[in-house]
Amino acid sequence: MSLLQSHLLMTLGLICLVHCENLVMMPFDHVSHVNFFVVTAHTLVKEGHSVTFVIAPRHKKTLDKHGLNYITYDSVNGDKSDDLRKAMENDVFGENKEPVSLMTTLSTIKNLVDNQKLDVLGDKGLKQQMDATEFNLAIIDGTLFCRYLYVLAYRHSIPYITLTASDDPLASGVTGLPSVQPLPAFWFTDNMSVTQRLINTFAQFMTLYVLPAVLYPNSIITEYAPNKPAVSMAFLYKQSELVLVNLQDVCLDYPRVTAPHYQMVGGMGAYPPHPLPENIESFIQGAKDGIVIMTFGSIFSKMPDRVLKKFFDAFKVFPKLRFIMRNSETTLKVPDNVLPLNWLPQNDILGHPKTILFITHGGNNGQLEAVYHGVPTLTFPLNGDQFSNAVRMRVKGFGLDLQMKTFTTESLIQNLIELTTNDTFRSKIKRCSAIVKEQMPAQEKVAHWVRHVLKYGSDHLKSHSIDMPLYQLLLLDVMCIMMLGLGIVSLLLTCCCRMVISKCCCRSGRKKIKSE
């Protein structure tokens, strides 16, 4: 080896020592969350970092496919995510038009969280592997249903960043305003009535205090991190070096109050399209009026034939359109203008110039991709934040929405006609697409902020609001003092007025007696 080559290798090694860090990623045990973290991991690998995942064994194929490192934990308590999926499918596609009760849903979720918490935090093999590896930074999914992952990072003294699709500013010490920031579970916009603001405020109080207390009692710290100081779960969440939220607040979502440590990075999975597989491309080229893509996410990859028949009957009315859909099983005869697939490259099809409409469940990632590529949507919200997502697309003029339990073939046909012939939807979402593409790409934002925190830390980004109790953050104590002051002033003025009136009455009474 020449002297020049040796010098070059030493230089590259020094650069790597300075800039390359060992990162661990902890996503929620759900396909869409793992896929989102995989996209983020590729961005960080390009930066030169080493990335390792902590995952359930069922996600190993996904990580192997992408050539990423991982540590697994044993699912000794059973994979209860199927129970949640079946409950959701029954709620959406069941014959009963009444929704599953809130208490039933919460009970299913609590069982899921309890089992996953035991699997992750109670796994001795995982603990040994984490002890044997020195991680510089953890990137943790901030979804409410997997916040036990913060205990894992805390136990092993790993600083961490939160990466989440859940906008939870108050939990991060940011002045989120329930008056203009609707909770994703509701059909509200940022322009709420008094009743809606009351409901929204109460619901945010429940998600901030009640639900976390039920899912994660503070005893979880002393049980699974006995050698660390006993702190609250709320404290652990606030200790995130940074909170990266997978939302696009420039033109898709509603403008909101943020802070330097609370950054919007919506659109990680949206990028210029790659060439499509030959079978998909040839099918698309046969479309005279364009392509419609339909998928309802990883949970609802198949639907009952009685529901699917309504879609097929509507699609037959548009012979010049072609429909690409994700649906794994059906006994129905598939129309000639429909291509069903077990899996489809959603972003790449949305980016195809012939794609004119996206029929979707309203998942956050899918909406961000639709906006990036400027494709109008027809949304069938199924659960969670999808109801709020459907509303924001409608009020911004980017699409329409229908209900899975109540839609008919006729209503679907009417919506398809409106969305494929009315250029207003396309022009509005194309404008939003242009605005989004003018911003720094989400991948670059994430890379920048991770690099920034690794180099400088995050103390300079955080406001004192993080350490303030909620009543101080919302100035409730100041308002109480002001109301008390106003009350005292009002009382004094009332007393003074009574005294003046009383004296005046006394004087007039004396004069009257003298005159008599």
Tell me what each language-model feature is.
Residues 25-38, 300-301:
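A short, glycine/small-residue-rich beta-strand->loop->alpha-helix junction that serves as a flexible
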Residues 29, 45-320, 332-336, 343, ...:
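Nucleotide-sugar-dependent glycosyltransferase catalytic domains
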Residues 34-45, 59:
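Short amphipathic alpha-helix
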Residues 154, 370-371, 394:
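Short alpha-helix at the nucleotide-sugar/activated-sugar donor binding site of glycosyltransferases
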Residues 338-339, 377, 395-404:
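A short acidic/histidine/glycine-rich donor-binding loop in glycosyltransferase catalytic cores
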Residues 407-424:
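C-terminal "capping" alpha-helix adjacent to the active site of nucleotide-linked donor transferases
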